[in-house]
């Protein structure tokens, strides 16, 4: 990892799944087409199995905090016993530039970030590569493949909703007809009741998450 010039900091992490695990900070340009505009640090979690093994890159759509857990391992990495590179999305948590100039938060910039990470890590992991993500991470997997079709060997988006706009318009008609009228009414009544009891229920949810070690 120290041989990768983009990495400015490396911290070891505990893992019950991998022989070695680290959180690293990878220097990225705000705009890959105009590097003179400045840089930011992107959090990348590296989980090692072997230099001769394939590598899964998780194209997270938001923050990477849950990937720090000693128990975390992405499904494909477990199935195929691969190394795992987990990339936090720019402008989330510890991958947020200062100042926050939102014009650089684009799908293309995110794909550029992933391309830079893959190019750097292929120097130590030369085997097959799989990209994968869930929900917005699934979108990110698809967009990464769109901008850089040759970076990975396989792309596996677990759910990849592509919205038509800020107001998509497809969700409401679907929700109005899915299931039976009685089932829809029960769900609506439950949701309203939970909102009415938010002040009482939220502390219980938080206590449960703390006791279970959920993040």
Language-model features and meaning:
Residues 1-83:
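Catalytic-loop region of hydrolases
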Residues 55-58, 84-87, 130-132, 154-157:
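Structural recognition of the beta-strand scaffold that forms the well-ordered cores
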Residues 63, 89-93, 162, 179:
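Alpha/beta-hydrolase active-site loop signature
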Residues 77-96:
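Conserved alpha/beta-hydrolase
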Residues 104-123:
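Alpha/beta-hydrolase active-site loop
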Residues 125-135:
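Alpha/beta-hydrolase fold nucleophile elbow
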Residues 133-137, 141, 145:
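Gly/Ala-rich beta-loop-alpha elbow adjacent to hydrolase catalytic centers
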Residues 143-215:
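Alpha/beta-hydrolase
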């Amino acid at each position: 990892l120290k041989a990768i010039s983009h990495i400015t900091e490396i911290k070891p992490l505990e893992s019950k799944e991998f022989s070695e695990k680290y959180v690293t900070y990878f220097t990225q340009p705000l705009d890959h087409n105009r590097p003179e505009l400045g840089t930011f640090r992107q959090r990348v979690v590296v989980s090692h199995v072997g230099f001769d093994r394939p590598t899964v890159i998780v194209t997270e759509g938001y923050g990477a905090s849950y990937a720090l857990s000693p128990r975390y391992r992405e499904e494909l990495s477990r199935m195929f016993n691969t190394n795992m590179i987990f990339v936090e999305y720019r402008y989330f948590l510890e991958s947020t530039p200062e100042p926050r100039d939102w014009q650089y938060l684009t799908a293309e910039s995110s794909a550029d970030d992933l391309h830079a990470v893959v190019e750097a890590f292929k120097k130590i992991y030369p085997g097959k590569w799989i990209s994968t993500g869930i929900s917005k991470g699934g979108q990110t997997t698809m967009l990464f493949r769109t901008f850089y079709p040759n970076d990975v060997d396989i792309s596996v988006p677990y759910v990849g909703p592509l919205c038509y706009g800020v107001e998509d318009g497809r969700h409401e008609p679907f929700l109005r007809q899915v299931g039976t009228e009685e089932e829809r009414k029960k769900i609506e009544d439950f949701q309203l009741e939970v909102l009415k009891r938010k002040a009482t229920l939220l502390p219980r949810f938080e206590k449960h998450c703390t006791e279970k070690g959920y993040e």
